[in-house]
A protein has these predicted regions:
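Auxiliary Fe-S-binding modules of radical SAM enzymes
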Residues: 1-29, 197-306
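Short Fe-S-cluster ligation motifs
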Residues: 40-61, 95-113, 285-287
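Short, conserved acidic/polar surface loops in the N-terminal third of protein domains
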Residues: 72-76, 82-87, 120-123, 148-149
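Conserved alpha-helical substructure of the radical SAM core
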Residues: 78-107, 276
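Flexible, glycine- and charge-enriched loops at secondary-structure boundaries
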Residues: 86-90, 177, 181, 263-267
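Positions that flank functional sites
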Residues: 89, 115-116, 292-293
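Conserved AdoMet/S-adenosylmethionine-binding subsite of the radical SAM
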Residues: 95-259
Length: 306
């Protein structure tokens, strides 16, 4: 169903918690790096998400340019921080969605879409009118407003969200977002209220619900414990309201070494995080293997599919 969403670039952008006020209609770029024309860097089947997302045929993943966070360790930094990507129309994005469906994708996976929300919703409306029937995944770093989550209502089926930090000093240092947890906590609660408990199809592929990810960082497992405490509190209040996913794949990309995290997490550190999660009862989800910290799992941003 069309929402009659305008794709006119915002005059004073408030799409993310930064509310930077960039006049994107005049060609200014926001804090996120996004301007007035939709931009993406890759669209292809992706096989390295959680099994209930990637399945056997892959997740139809579209990587959008720009990001509302500035994570110093971002594995996607060429597109999130350096502006790599190609400008496209809303109509072409709709064609990309339909093409991924034709390739057999289990879902359409929107990676860091928040800065392009009005454009993407319009493209989804066009694609659905032309036969798109797959679940739509919002793959987000968790730095959202409740208003943004609500604006996606009717367009998103699955929230694949990070809960990166609790510590405001750590989120300021590593992602330039001292208010990360203050924004992410209510936003994630809104995601869970909107999507409801997880629903799977006969193949075990998620059709609706929330997957809540946490990437354990070297030297900062105390903050991981705080994140897991918050996850456990949600699970205790409403058992099964999300699928936990604890990840070990941290690799020191981009400017990580400048911020004291220029190494991979040790087996000892990660085992402590996993044990803590299990002790809290966060067992009905995913615990990534330590061997997943490999650079080859990062896709090539070569404009494939764009």
């Amino acid at each position: 169903m069309s929402k009659n969403i305008s794709t006119t670039p915002p005059v004073s952008c408030t799409l993310c918690p930064r509310r930077c006020g960039a006049d994107r209609s005049a060609g200014q770029t926001g804090f996120c790096g996004a301007g007035g024309t939709l931009k993406a860097a890759r669209a292809a089947l992706h096989f390295w998400e959680e099994p209930c997302i990637s399945g056997t045929r892959g997740s139809g993943t579209v990587f959008f340019s720009g990001c509302t966070l500035k994570c110093c360790f971002c594995q996607n930094y060429p597109i999130s921080a350096e502006g790599l990507g190609k400008e496209i129309t809303v109509e072409h994005l709709a064609e990309i969605f339909l093409g991924l469906q034709e390739q057999g994708a289990h879902n359409i996976n929107l990676v860091t879409p928040g800065q392009w929300r009005p454009w993407i919703i319009a493209a989804l409306d066009i694609a659905r009118a032309e036969g798109l029937r797959l679940p739509i995944v919002c793959n987000t770093g968790g730095y959202e407003t409740v208003e943004s989550v609500e604006a996606w209502r009717g367009s998103i089926d699955i929230w694949l969200a990070d809960l990166k930090y609790v510590s405001s000093s750590l989120s300021a240092e590593l992602s330039s977002a001292p208010d990360y947890f203050a924004q992410a906590r209510p936003a994630i609660e809104a995601m869970m209220a909107q999507a409801g408990h997880p629903v799977f199809d006969s193949e075990g592929i998620l059709q609706k619900g929330v997957i809540l990810r946490h990437l354990a960082l070297p030297g900062h497992i105390d903050d991981s414990f705080a994140v897991l405490d918050q996850m456990a509190a949600w699970n205790e209040a409403d058992p099964g309201c999300f699928i936990p996913s604890v990840m070990s794949q941290y690799t020191p990309f981009y400017k990580a070494a400048e911020h004291g995290i220029g190494r991979r997490i040790t087996t000892y550190e990660y085992r402590r995080v996993v044990n803590y999660a299990m002790d809290l009862g966060l067992t009905a989800g995913y615990m990534q293997q330590k061997s997943s910290a490999r650079e080859e799992y990062t896709p090539s941003f070569d404009l494939t599919g764009i």
